[in-house]
Amino acid sequence: MDPTAPLADTIAAIATAVVPEQGSVGIVRLSGSRALPIVQAIFTPARRNAVWESHRLLYGWIRDEKGQILDEALAVWMQAPRSYTREDVAELHCHGGIMVVQATLQQCLRQGARLAQPGEFSLRAFLNGRIDLTQAESVADLVAARSPQAARMALAGLQGKLGGSIRALRQELLGLLAEIEARLDFEEDLPPLDVAAWQARLQAIQTQIQALLATAERGQLLRTGVKVAIVGRPNVGKSSLLNAWSGQDRAIVTDLPGTTRDVVESHLVVKGIPVQLLDTAGIRATEDPVERLGVERSQRLAQAADVLVLVIDAQAGWTAADAAIYESIRHRPLILVINKTDLAPPEGIPLPPEIAHRVPAVAAQGKGIPELEEALEQLVTQGRPQPNLEISLNQRQAAALQQAQASLEQVGQAIQAQLPLDFWSIDLRGALHALGQITGEEISESVLDQIFSRFCIGK
C-alpha cells in the first residue's frame, strides 16, 4: 500500500468477490466526504421524492454518464461516524457478475473517486480509531478463514478480545512503571519500594504473556492449515483414498496403473485444521511423455507438502518400488497407509520399523479414514494436547509479545543484580513499546504498510 495515498480522497472499490461466474449480488463501496454526492450522481431512486437517510436502503437504477441504465440496484448511505471507517460510507448493491459491477465502479471513478488500495478501508477504520490493529488483522483473518475454528478465533479478535487483553497488560505495566518513576522523582517523599510485592506483580504479568504466547502455534495451524500430498506407486489406491477422505469423487479410479496423470486437489477440515489434499500421479519410470510430466510435477509438489501420505498395496506387500519412494521421502513428516488390508496375506507385511505413523485402510470402502485423521493430528501437533482457543496470536503479534517478555526478563535480571531503578524503567518502557506495536498504539508507517498491503481491495 502506498503510504502517500491522500486520506482526504474519497475511495471506491468492489467489496465482494469478483469471479468469472455470475454472482447473485455485487457491492461497490465508497468512503470519504464525497461518497454520497458521487452515489447521488449515478444512482436514480425509483421514488421521485426519495430522501437520502443514513442507514436506509433506496431502490432504483444505476446510470452511466449518458443517462443509460446500467443496472437495477439498491443504494445505502452511512453517515460518519456511524460507519466502518468513521467516514461517510456509501454502497451500491448491484446484480453480481463482472461486467455490471465493474461498470458501476467505473462510474464512481468518473465522478471523482479514487480506486482504493488493498486494505485501505480497514486502514482508515484503524487511523480513525474505529478499530485497533488486532481487530484490523482479524478482518483479514475472518475473510481468509478456512475452518469454523479459524473463523471463531478471527471473530473474537474482531470483537476486540485480543486487543483488550493486550491493553490490560499495558495498564498493569504502566502501574509498575509509575511506582518506579515516582520514586525516581520523589524518592524523599515516598516510602521504600516493596520490591517483593512489585516483583510478584511483574511475574504475574509474565505468566499472562506466556499464556498468550502459547496460543500462537495452534492459531497459526488453524489459520494456514497443512498441505498433504498422497504419494506412492501407481494403482495402490491413492485416488480411492482421496475420494474417501474428501467425501467426493474428485479423482478417477480404475484398475489401470497411471490413470492419474496430473495432481488432483481437494480441501477439507481435519479436527479443526484446514487441509489441502493433493492426489499425485503414481511414481514410476514411464515412456509416456504425458505421464512422465505428471510424475515430475507430483515429485515437485511432494517436496513442497507439509505432510506426505505414502500409500502401499497390502496385497502386493512392501515392494522394491515402495522402498525406492520411501528412501526419497523418509526424512519428511510421513504417514504410511497400508491400503487393501482386506486382501492382505494372513502372515502380515514386513515394514520398515522406523515408520511411526501407520494406518491400515480399505480406501474403496472408506475404512481407515478416522485413524488417518488421528495420525495426521498427532503428526502436525507432535502429540501435544491442543487447547480450544478463543483467541490466538499471529506471527507478527507473537514476535512483538516475545520482545515484551524479553524486556521483562531483563527487568528481573536488573532486580537480581540490584541495579538502580533507572535500569528497571528502561526495560519496562521497552516492554510497553512492544505491546503497543500489537494494538497499533506505537507502530511505524512501514509496518502498517506491510500489514494492510496483505488485505484484498475493498476491505
UniProtKB/Swiss-Prot annotation:
Annotated residues for binding of (6S)-5-formyl-5,6,7,8-tetrahydrofolate: R29, E91, R130, K459
Claim: Ligase is one of the keywords in the record: no
GO terms (BP aspect) = tRNA methylation; tRNA wobble uridine modification
TM helices/strands, residue ranges: none
Q: Among its keywords, does the record have GTP-binding?
A: yes
Stated EC number for the protein is 3.6.-.-
Matching entries from PROSITE patterns are given as: G_TRME
Matches recorded under InterPro entries: G_TrmE (IPR031168), GTP-bd (IPR006073), GTP-bd_TrmE_N (IPR018948), GTPase_MnmE (IPR004520), MnmE_dom2 (IPR027368), MnmE_helical (IPR025867), P-loop_NTPase (IPR027417), Small_GTP-bd (IPR005225)
Which residues of this UniProt protein bind Mg(2+)? S239, T260
**UniProt-recorded name of the protein:** tRNA modification GTPase MnmE
* Biological source species: Synechococcus sp. (strain JA-2-3B'a(2-13)) (Cyanobacteria bacterium Yellowstone B-Prime)
